[in-house]
């Protein structure tokens, strides 16, 4: 059994390479243990060697997120751009209001980047401070936001009204510098650009901003179900 576990760590079958991490090996060993246990209980075999093999321990990955001070520094960096390169600064004045709104929205609501880029102008309700988003699976839901998020979105929308979008992108809330609906990749690069000026020890992605939001929400409410 131990040789089997060593084998499935990396093997080639029908010309294809296969690997299994700790989680994959634990899943396969659990199935093997159940198989042996059944035959042992049915007295088909006289011993159960699988019972002597411990399940692999899963090493939990550290959750990477920004702390409160880093969030403040991140948003300050988006506004002033003091640590950006010369080439990045060329576009900074054109995009900083949009970038502040986008990052404030991600940090303030915990929505996915795909949900963020999919926002249309009519999806934002400033009267009730809510946005209508489309979740995985196609269903719609309303997420509410704070006054801070509302102010950032208002500032961007005021500028957005003076931009003429390309045909087919008229309804998009967030636009790229090419006046198209901004893409997931563009937001990922945007987050990476600003986050690198705040911390070089953490690899911050839009998903990590969701972790930051979730952690903050849990610390404020103590309700894990709200975070989920």
Listing of model-derived features with the role each one plays in the protein:
Residues 1-228:
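Conserved catalytic core of the tyrosine transesterase superfamily
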